[in-house]
Regions:
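P-loop/Walker A phosphate-binding loop and immediately adjacent motor/lid segment at beta-alpha junctions
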Residues: 86-91, 143-171
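Core AdoMet radical
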Residues: 35-50, 62-77, 96-116, 127-141, ...
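Charged helix-capping and loop-helix junction motifs
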Residues: 48-52, 80-87, 115-122
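Flexible, glycine-rich phosphate/dinucleotide-binding loops
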Residues: 12, 108, 166
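N-terminal [4Fe-4S]-dependent radical SAM core
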Residues: 1-22, 31, 35-42, 169
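Glycine-centered loop/turn positions within well-structured domains
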Residues: 28
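Short, charged beta->alpha transition segments
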Residues: 52-60
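Catalytic-core regions built around general acid/base machinery
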Residues: 86-93, 122-125, 129
Length: 171
């Protein structure tokens, strides 16, 4: 997996101060996407053990609330496979910090369902690591600058207490 960018001390992509990882690769190609260059799976730099260690170290300070995954598309199956070991390490090291994940896929139909478009052999484990999932493709006609943590009104901010039982997260 490649990644397009890392933002340290990010306050735009989740509650609190966070480290945000922008992965490369996305098959949605939403018109109006804010990060078109990250559609290409080969864009950016390889995600290595050193990258993972740097991200983990950036989350050590108490003022860092957690990690945010964006893209590109973190829930593309090939990205899930690369991210899962890192997310497991993150949860082991920081059990009180949260993980936010932005995806153009829809939770119930594309990720949770065994025949979903993005469901693969690691999806269930990946979702166990995610605390807040912002789901749904960006739709330019539904763009609303007043929305917190999402770009279009079709997107939902879901708190995942356990896979299969999401709740809308109050923002």
């Amino acid at each position: 997996m490649n990644y397009a960018n890392i933002k340290y001390c990010d306050i735009a992509n989740g509650l609190g101060v966070r480290t945000s990882l922008f992965v490369s690769g996305c098959t949605h190609h939403c018109p109006g996407c804010f990060n078109r260059e990250a559609w290409d799976f080969d864009y950016g730099m390889p995600f290595t053990e050193q990258t993972a260690d740097t991200l983990l170290n950036s989350c050590i300070p108490d003022y860092i609330k957690g990690l945010t995954l964006l893209g590109g598309e973190p829930m593309e199956p090939e990205n899930q496979r690369a991210l899962l070991p890192f997310l497991v390490r993150f949860k082991e090291k920081f059990p009180k910090k949260d993980i936010w994940c932005y995806t153009g896929y829809t939770y119930e139909t594309d990720l949770l369902a065994p025949d979903g478009r993005a469901h693969c052999e690691v999806t269930d484990k990946m979702l166990e690591c995610v605390d807040i999932l912002v789901d749904g493709e960006f739709i330019q006609d539904l763009y609303d600058i007043s929305l917190k943590f999402r770009g279009s009104s079709n997107q939902r901010v879901l708190q995942i207490h356990q896979p299969g039982c999401p709740e809308l997260f109050p923002v």
